[in-house]
From Swiss-Prot:
It is found in: Nucleus. SUPFAM superfamilies: RmlC-like cupins. The keyword Lipid biosynthesis does not apply. It comes from Arabidopsis thaliana (Mouse-ear cress). It holds the Pfam family Pirin_C. This is Putative pirin-like protein At3g59260.
Amino acid sequence: MKVMVLSLGKASPSKSDHELLDPFVSLVEFSVSPPGGFKDHPHRGFESVTYMFQGGIIHQDCNGNKGTIHEGDVQWMTAGRGIIHSEMPEEQVNKGLQLWINLPSSAKMIEPKNIEISSSEIPSADDYGVEVKVIAGESMGVKSPFYTKTPIMFLDFTLDPKAQTHQAVPESWTAFAYIVEGDEGVFSSSDSSTVQAHNVVVFGTGDEVSVWNTSNSRPLRFLLIAGEPIGEPVVQHGPFVMNSQDEIEMTIGDYRNGMNGFEMAKHWRSE
């Protein structure tokens, strides 16, 4: 299995990025403090997964959902046909990661949904110096109870010094790893070069992902994310992810006119 290392810092994925990482649209590691944050804004056509590393994010949306996720918690939001929400920092230092997952054309106009998953609800396993938290999918005999519209795997691994792991992944799926902590991880082949933290490793075709922590003293933490490609055109315009430019223009019109999923646009404001 070949790998490609990407830096996480590109604000606007290109068409080739979408094809390479299908069904994933974007991955962003964030650090936000008051008075900053993400004030009221719309979305359509995808799902987002927010995973907290430190602090807390207060979430509100136009459907009456309100809550706060803290370290180890997950917010899984299906934007579907339309949602307006805010994401604001709770503490002075708030860090996490947000993944956008595309929806197939048949599901882009489904009803929006928001699920908060506390860290205590996320199943985990620990064996031979390898710990995994199973946010979506299955690993080390443990399966997540949470259903995802687009089939994906979202695993949070921590490897002790000199530990290794081998994770099965469906051969047709897109798979990549994001290194959260540790600079001596080796991916795919034991003789590959080490990859530093805050980089993305994109895996080639294969049915297994292998990872070694070559450090003598430091743990290696990484997220392994994989999903079934949708194979449809992707056109992204800011917070909207559709299949064509015509659909993007229709979405902008729906938002401006408060219709087809954006009925609350003219009246709703977060607290």
